């Protein structure tokens, strides 16, 4: 490709890229100009620029200035260097452009750009469960298996990934929760209950906070720090060797220690130390740093009239030397980051302060933004993040170096009742989880590590929509539905530039990110053009993240495809037409040109052949070819009836529809037409140009750039949602449809994206189910016969090697001679949205709906995922990627679902021949003869000896069926099947009633009134008995012997209670 520098200049710049058409460069020459220029050379170049007219130099002049400073490049490298420097595209370089290029080179090497996160620190939904305590949890602790403090000689480089073993109790420990009634509950790291216990203790002053410091090696004495309500701090020091003073004693299930005995030295294993009245108020938080051999203790001083803001909020004690960190109102909580030698404090004054431990007079930074007192702070030193929680349950995340706010998390306000104010917090530094305890247990993951046993990491925070390779800068550009544009260096795996919030829209005062749906480069690949879902387009200088130009096709109409040719930009999407923008200097901001609107549905995809034509396809299966120079359509097809000629004119119904849609759009303004309305406009029974009633949508189109525009050469591939790829015979004005082939092997799958190599020998397809297929299309169509070396293809593509059974991918195409399927494997778990190919190193990379962009060799070997936390395999743009001696691994997510074909292709390993079983011999001959097969496999070494009966051992045998199953002949002569007529229905019988026992019958016939005698009584409190007084009878006979006998009995009893009453 050769582009003229300008119309007024005769200078021509040859744009050479690293491709199969360029000669191989034996030695890579660096284009990093900032590494080659010294300070003296830069001053001389500045003087030379100032001596030039207008302080500008041309193509040859700049090369001469560099030669004067002994900086030389060959022709190919200098061409690329000049295009990188010339950002104004006028082929004249001024001093600002030259210095900007040097600055960009230093920015690419800045390691801070690698640590910028794509997602918010707290982006995972919290887990909530009940505490199972009778009252509110007042304390949460962690039974640690590993210490957070590590000796300096054992400090290693921190990594941001894990292998999944940190969830075990041996690595993460157990949680312990306590409530006011003395109940203790033990939990696993996943908050599953283990057991329950109770605890009681007594001290002269109640202990309010504790801290425990220890090393894993056990060479340093462990420290147990106690802070009480009186402002005292006590330290217990003991050796952890052989469990120290906590050794089990025979006959004692529980070891009790009295503090007075510890002070008197009766327990020699424990060394106490007291700091009486270290603070005048209650100790709020304590910590002992073994690395600095220092004690930190804080207290709150809320009585401003008494202390007048001169209170020592935090005191650091080192070898009996005290350092006072004065904070108004005191300190409620703090966190010591020993790796950074800083202390982060928070208190009732709503400020988060960052201190240097050796400068107590003034904080290094003050973070403001909370509306309530700070109750919890902690630091992630490896991530350079500070987390703070206030009294109103709002979590804020800060950058430790730049002291900026990263995130405000308010989900706790919704999960916790407003009446719950005294919450307990604990941060698990190993699992990176924040535990919030009250009436509920809430676990919040704070910037969790990547589980490399489950995934290699993500490239974007949302599905990747477009991937591109820039041949000028030799980097990969990915665009996602998260509205991010990221520039990657594929040779080192580094992230060079990240641009966030690229397309935005304000809705009700809130800025909303708009998804990026299309992207491409300019012809010289200096600028990037992106299209979004709301119809906006932007031109980016993606080296400095600057927007050069803003455009739009139609409000709220998604851009599905963009094309950038010389002096023109073409955009198409849901507005059903092609919009042309000028790219000529001086005419950039004029009104765009609208091509004729012949499509009746939304445009889904488009492609261009430079200098010849453009092809567009719609959701309803329409395909139209356009002249690139004039924008006039010359051929129209329908994929449902591709051989039928369709005249390029609108029918009366379509003209009426167009006029109606124009009126509707003029009335609604920026309102968006739904896709369903656009599809249901044509009548279902009118199939003149649309084939069947159900439309077939076009998913992707691909132009073969090396195929000439003749009737005999096919040049366009069209992918349908049915899984087929139709081959349009030619984009010639008299060309037509030729053939089609099945491109998937699973029902419901279809090709979503396609690309090809520079010479159009292979076509790479990505499907909706995540499969990658490589097709050899040199002899497709069959009229163009070229000799193909099949052994060479088998060496490169292991998929083509013979197997003992035909796999599913091969069974589908076993009767299809052309095109030849050379590779097929599963690359992603979700749909593949975009695919691209790097020619010289033979690398294929894809952007998927699973948030990742992965690099593969042409043969199917896995190279890596952009944005991974694992080490990157070194690649070169001048050498072919992959070697036969290299061991390749599988992506962790693919490894769990991979088929035998995918495992063979990705690993590159295939068993030559399976083990054959020996022929069946008589039982007496088996022990004498060997079971050696023809292939050299010894089955006796594999299986040892034949299994003996019973193979399953002693087990329960199911009883046999008592009756045979009755065969049911279903009557299918009627319009429905009477199923109930064939069912066995057993009539119910009355159960025999058992006779009632005589005792129960006698009890049931009794009347409790027969045993009832009304009495009058009152309670005698002195004697704790009842004085019963029977009611008088109606007919009292004085001479009745029964009355005389009753009176005599009463006289004998006297006033005291009877023995029977006492017993009662």
From Swiss-Prot:
Keywords: Repeat, WD repeat. Residues 925-935 have a biased composition (Acidic residues). WD repeats lie at residues 153-197, 326-365, 369-408, 459-498, 511-550, 598-638, 746-785, 827-866. Residues 914-935, 1023-1064 are annotated as: Disordered. The keyword Amino-acid biosynthesis does not apply. Residues 914-924 have a biased composition (Basic and acidic residues). InterPro entries: EF-hand-dom_pair, WD-EF-hand_domain, WD40/YVTN_repeat-like_dom_sf, WD40_repeat_dom_sf, WD40_rpt. Coiled coil: none annotated. It holds the Pfam family WD40. PANTHER family: EF-HAND CALCIUM BINDING DOMAIN 8, WD40 REPEAT DOMAIN 95. This is WD repeat-containing protein on Y chromosome. The gene is WDY.
């Amino acid at each position: 490709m050769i582009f003229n520098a300008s119309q007024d200049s005769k200078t021509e710049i040859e744009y050479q890229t690293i491709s199969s058409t360029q000669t191989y460069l034996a030695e890579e020459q660096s284009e990093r100009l900032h590494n080659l220029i010294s300070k003296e050379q830069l001053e001389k170049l500045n003087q030379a620029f100032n001596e030039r007219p207008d302080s500008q130099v041309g193509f040859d002049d700049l090369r001469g200035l560099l030669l004067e400073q002994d900086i030389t490049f060959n022709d190919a490298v200098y061409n690329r260097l000049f295009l990188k420097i010339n950002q104004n595209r006028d082929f004249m370089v001024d001093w600002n452009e030259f210095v900007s290029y040097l600055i960009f080179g230093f920015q690419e090497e800045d390691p801070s750009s690698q640590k910028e996160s794509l997602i918010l620190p707290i982006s995972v939904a919290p887990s909530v469960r009940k505490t199972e305590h009778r009252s509110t949890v007042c304390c949460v602790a962690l039974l640690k298996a590993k210490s957070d403090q590590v000796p300096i000689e054992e400090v290693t480089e921190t990594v941001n990934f894990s292998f999944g073993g940190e969830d075990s109790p041996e690595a993460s420990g157990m949680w312990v929760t306590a409530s006011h009634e003395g109940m203790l509950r033990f939990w696993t790291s996943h908050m599953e209950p283990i057991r329950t216990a109770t605890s009681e203790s007594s001290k002269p002053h109640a202990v309010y906070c504790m801290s425990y410091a220890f090393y894993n090696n056990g060479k340093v004495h462990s420290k147990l720090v106690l802070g009480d309500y009186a402002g005292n701090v006590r330290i217990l020091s003991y050796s952890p060797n052989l469990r120290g003073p906590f050794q089990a004693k025979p006959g004692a299930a529980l070891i009790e220690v009295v503090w007075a005995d510890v002070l008197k030295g009766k327990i020699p294993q424990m060394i106490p130390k007291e700091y009486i009245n270290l603070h005048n108020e209650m100790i709020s938080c304590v910590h002992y740093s073994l690395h600095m051999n220092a004690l930190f203790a804080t207290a709150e001083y809320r009585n401003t009239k008494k202390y007048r803001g001169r209170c020592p909020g935090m005191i650091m004690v080192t070898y009996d030397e005290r350092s006072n960190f004065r904070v108004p109102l005191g300190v409620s909580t703090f966190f010591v980051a020993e790796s950074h030698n800083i202390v982060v404090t928070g208190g009732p004054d709503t400020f988060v302060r960052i201190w240097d431990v050796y400068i107590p007079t003034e904080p290094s930074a003050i973070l403001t933004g909370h509306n309530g007192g700070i109750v919890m702070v902690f630091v992630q030193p490896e991530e350079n993040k500070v987390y703070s929680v206030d009294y109103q349950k709002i979590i804020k995340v800060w950058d430790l170096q730049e002291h900026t706010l990263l995130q405000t998390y308010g989900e706790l306000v919704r999960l916790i009742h407003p009446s719950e104010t005294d919450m307990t917090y604990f941060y698990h530094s190993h699992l990176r989880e924040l535990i919030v305890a009250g009436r509920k247990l809430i676990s919040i993951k704070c910037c969790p590590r990547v589980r490399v046993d489950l995934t290699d990491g993500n490239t974007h925070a949302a599905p990747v929509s477009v991937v591109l390779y820039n041949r000028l800068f030799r980097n990969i550009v990915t665009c996602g539905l998260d509205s991010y544009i990221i520039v990657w260096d594929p040779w080192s795996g580094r992230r060079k530039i990240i641009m966030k919030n690229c397309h935005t829209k304000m809705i009700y005062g809130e800025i909303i990110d708009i998804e990026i749906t299309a992207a491409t480069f300019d012809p010289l690949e200096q600028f990037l053009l992106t299209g979004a879902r709301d119809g906006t387009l932007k031109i980016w200088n993606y080296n400095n993240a600057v927007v050069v130009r803003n455009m739009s096709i139609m409000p709220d109409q998604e851009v599905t495809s963009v094309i950038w040719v010389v002096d023109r930009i073409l955009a198409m999407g849901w507005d059903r037409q092609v919009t042309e923008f000028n790219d000529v200097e001086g005419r950039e901001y004029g009104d765009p040109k609208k091509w004729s609107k012949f499509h009746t549905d939304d445009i889904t995809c488009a492609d261009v052949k430079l200098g010849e034509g453009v092809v567009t396809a719609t959701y309803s299966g329409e395909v139209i070819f356009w002249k690139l120079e004039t924008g006039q359509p010359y051929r129209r097809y329908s994929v449902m009836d591709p051989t039928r000629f369709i005249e390029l004119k609108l029918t009366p119904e379509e003209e009426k529809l167009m006029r109606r849609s124009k009126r509707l759009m003029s009335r609604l303004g920026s309102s968006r037409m739904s896709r369903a309305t656009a599809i249901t406009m044509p009548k279902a029974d009118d199939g003149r140009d649309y084939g069947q009633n159900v439309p077939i949508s076009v998913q992707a189109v691909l132009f073969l750039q090396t195929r000439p525009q003749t009737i005999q050469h096919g040049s366009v591939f069209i992918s349908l949602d049915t899984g087929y790829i139709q081959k349009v015979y030619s984009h010639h004005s008299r060309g037509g449809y030729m053939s089609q082939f099945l491109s998937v092997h699973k029902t419901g799958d279809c090709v979503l994206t396609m690309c090809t190599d520079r010479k159009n020998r292979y076509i790479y397809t990505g499907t909706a189910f995540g499969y990658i297929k490589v097709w050899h299309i040199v002899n497709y169509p069959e009229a163009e016969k070229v000799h193909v070396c099949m052994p060479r293809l088998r060496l490169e593509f292991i998929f083509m090697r013979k197997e003992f059974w035909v796999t599913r991918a091969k069974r589908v195409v076993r009767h299809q001679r052309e095109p030849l399927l050379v590779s097929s494997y599963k690359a992603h778990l979700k749909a593949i949205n975009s695919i691209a190919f790097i020619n010289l190193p033979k690398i294929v990379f894809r952007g998927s709906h699973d948030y990742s962009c992965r690099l593969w060799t042409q043969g199917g070997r896995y190279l890596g995922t952009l944005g991974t936390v694992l080490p990157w395999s070194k690649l070169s743009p001048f050498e072919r990627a992959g070697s036969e001696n290299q061991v390749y691994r599988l992506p962790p997510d693919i490894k769990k679902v991979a088929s035998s074909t995918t495992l063979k292709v990705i690993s590159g390993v295939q068993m030559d021949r399976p083990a054959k079983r020996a022929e069946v011999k008589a039982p007496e001959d088996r022990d004498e003869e060997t079971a050696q097969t023809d292939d050299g496999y010894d089955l006796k070494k594999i299986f040892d000896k034949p299994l003996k009966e019973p193979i399953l051992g002693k087990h329960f045998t199911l009883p046999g069926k008592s009756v045979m199953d009755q065969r049911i002949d279903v009557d299918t002569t009627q319009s429905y099947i009477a199923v109930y007529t064939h069912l066995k229905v057993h009539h119910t019988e009355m159960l025999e009633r058992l006779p009632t026992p005589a005792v129960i019958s006698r009890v049931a016939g009794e009347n409790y009134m027969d045993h009832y005698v009304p009495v009058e009584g009152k309670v005698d409190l002195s004697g704790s008995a009842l004085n019963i007084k029977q009611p008088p009878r109606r007919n009292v006979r004085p001479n009745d012997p029964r009355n005389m006998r009753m009176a005599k009995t009463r006289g004998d009893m006297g006033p005291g209670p009877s023995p029977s009453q006492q017993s009662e």
